């Protein structure tokens, strides 16, 4: 028998049409592998059968299989909650955000295919090997085929089981001696119940921020530090992370102090602060993917030490520390160079000085700034709280389709669903990035983060290219979100000169509350919803006389009130017809007059 | 504990952020404790006014505008590099003054000067009495103002759940200088009276 149990591989029979409880496995007994992973496949259930139910052939008999059983229950418990109705099983995944993505039932049916799978398991494959060979089944097969529960894939379930297993296995806090494990199923079941109550884990949501107000290209290095922070944490705690965006992490762990000390040290070395909301509960109580929903949740804010008073001068970038460096004098002094800059001097603290001193990888943006080109900033933001609420509503709708008597409380969102979503969201970001590269070309695109882009632009017309691109991708990946007036994925586009201080753009983008925001620096803002992206694009294709819009745009520069009077003035019939035409397209979106004028400026370009 | 609410109106207002984008001077989109308390102290010759302010978010008010001007060195008579200044026009906001000895006998309407570029005509504000606020029941929400941490009890801020820290300038009396004191900025998650929170 091999030495290692690969937890992810525990649900082997779900790749086939065989019963999960081995009741029709007898004819393949000769092909059963002799590995520890296979022992996990057989022994990861511990269920005392109810009357009339077929029993599982085995139960956990050692520490490894017992931990696998707990991990499997913890991972599946997130999506496998009881429902009081029966119906036809569905073995393919139903994506709540993308129901039109129909998966085929690709499970292995033929005896020879199943024998091939068993032979593959006999070679003691890794999880990577399994994914390489059977990924098509893993992503299409629902983890749970019961009606209304087929919302997560087997792949997601396997990944989560692996994560939980390793955290339990290497924990110094969760104790399980071999002597505690008895040989009968009843005692094994009792032990499961006891450990699920006894073992308490922490669920935490961390949000990273920075105090810097970046205004030069090199100040954007702080965004690299943000990226490095999340990636360092990911490397250090690969099994603990359940969800991650560019500045947020949802994770679980057993020892708060040890984990927080490490994260604090990473954040501090990257000049970031963070807030953490966490709760410690027994395994059996942790179900929702939000620590705030658990009893006893607490919030901590991990800032670097802040003095009560700072004597002038204060740092001009972060405004959080005494300035003891002068830019660029002190920077040049490091290289024994005399100052050659024609720009003014700035008082910076040590941290901001170090960030600015780092060479910037944004070389194209630097060139565009020197040439004073126009740029488009594009930020894609995922609102986690909105995401959980949206998924809950979509799940409720789905349950009701299967069973009109389903209750709202049945539609609980579990980690597996969030993890399932994360995989599609990451694929979506990658696709957006690739398509931006195709549409604008490498020379005009700077990828600042995986959800923040800077594009050299020739004019406002590129904003429409971006809108078309979003419309297309939202339709492919998350069509259900397009029906919402306030969805969890937010697009922020800002047009400005490359020289325009980034912190002004960042302030707008990071505080974005609507799901589609278009900022034309110095010219106005459009706030609307992705739901109306079609209408917005349709409105651009209307036939309007340019002169009518030119008049309105020019008047608005003097007085927006006067422009509004002109907009509603029927005395100039020809202009009024154009305005009415535009109103018909834009007013249903709830756009105010300021938004309409901004839109006119967009069209004027 | 009670507060007096005044409405604030101005044609144009520039309350500068300390950071500057080289030749760009941004402005704050709120009225910090330091600015409004200082303006009231100057107006009425006192030193113990405690007040904060917020700007209305209705789209017709507080429009962002830009002014380009070239400051001139009076000694040499030479103009410096032109600066682009961000300012607010058609300003409308509300000011909440803590009721204490300093706030006794405030007029129904008065004029104060707030922010920078006063010599260019910015910052002339009209304060008009609106109402007295006695309901200061705290609730959880997102803070909409900037005030020094030491003044949190004055404004009945009971708990700071998720702070956004920053520093506000505090002048040293009878000098032309001052210090920066640790403060709570807009965006903090707090338990505070409703009028201090975002709607």
What are these regions (language model features)?
Chain A
Residues 1-605:
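Regulatory and interdomain segments flanking nucleotide-handling catalytic cores
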